[in-house]
């Protein structure tokens, strides 16, 4: 299978490219604009892989996208601006990349008559939930500009399925963690700060709850959905591991050998969703199960970010 992975030099995208090359005979083309969150370094050791080609470029470049899609059987779209705080400070690049960029890919996919288009989305499109778990049938209710643009892209993908019969799939994943994550994200940021004896800024009272999945488990789920998922469907990918931000911070401090005195409660973020939780029953029915515990994943992260496992 010939796979075009957009945003494949970012955190999850690069881990997925590595996963494909390690676990299949697929030919993979990675397209990435190498903005601040993407780097060739994330693909170190794989840039010269015989089944891999890296292309620097933007998903909004229709001519380039057309050239790449013409040789692809499937498209997996990770390309996105993905930081909530940055989206609150300025939404324009999020709208441009996450919505308009997705439209460019969809149009190219339609013209090329591809076999599958997998849109990588997020549980944040559902908004917050205080009890229970979101299923794929729940309405979208995003509460910040980032998640709003991802929800918009999801709806656009769905519309191309309904109006053009494009063979689309959508995955919505909970919070990922693991190697090659940008240092602005909570777990790598707090690991580094804890190890350096710095304070760890926790929004509000730290009670906001997130569901965490190790990135390798997510990549395995994405691969199963890509190959076995039913066209036109949405699949939640979650681990069932829910932790408050304070609990996550305490586990990081314990893993690094820091002190709880390093915790600093700061003013809460605008539009800060209280809790995310998703039901992954539908994805598990395809034969997937998460394998990594949070503690084992965190240990691997500490080794990676503190230089013991390059």
UniProtKB/Swiss-Prot annotation:
Positions that bind NAD(+): 7-13, 32-35, 58-59, 97, 146-150, 176
Enzyme Commission number, as recorded: 4.2.1.-
Binding-site residues, substrate: 82, 122-124, 175, 185-186, 201-203, 210, 245, 269-272
Domain of life: Archaea
A GO molecular function held by the record: dTDP-glucose 4,6-dehydratase activity
InterPro entries reported for this sequence: dTDP_Gluc_deHydtase, NAD(P)-bd_dom, NAD(P)-bd_dom_sf
Cofactor: NAD(+)
UniProt pathway: Protein modification; protein glycosylation; Cell surface structure biogenesis; S-layer biogenesis
Knocked-out gene: effects: Impaired formation of the tetrasaccharide present at 'Asn-532' of S-layer glycoprotein Csg. No effect on 'Asn-47' and 'Asn-117' glycosylation of S-layer glycoprotein Csg.
Keyword field: Lyase, NAD
Lyase listed as a keyword: yes
Co-factor note (free text): Binds 1 NAD(+) per subunit.
GO term, biological process aspect, one: S-layer organization
Active site: 123-124, 146
Purpose of the protein: Lyase involved in N-glycan biosynthetic pathway that takes place under low-salt conditions (1.75 M instead of 3.4 M). Participates in the formation of the tetrasaccharide present at 'Asn-532' of S-layer glycoprotein Csg, consisting of a sulfated hexose, 2 hexoses and rhamnose. Involved in the addition of final rhamnose (sugar 4) of the tetrasaccharide on the dolichol phosphate carrier.
NCBIfam families: dTDP_gluc_dehyt
Family, per entry: Belongs to the NAD(P)-dependent epimerase/dehydratase family. dTDP-glucose dehydratase subfamily.
Protein name: Low-salt glycan biosynthesis protein Agl12
Organism from which the protein derives: Haloferax volcanii (strain ATCC 29605 / DSM 3757 / JCM 8879 / NBRC 14742 / NCIMB 2012 / VKM B-1768 / DS2)
Species classification: Archaea, Methanobacteriati, Methanobacteriota, Stenosarchaea group, Halobacteria
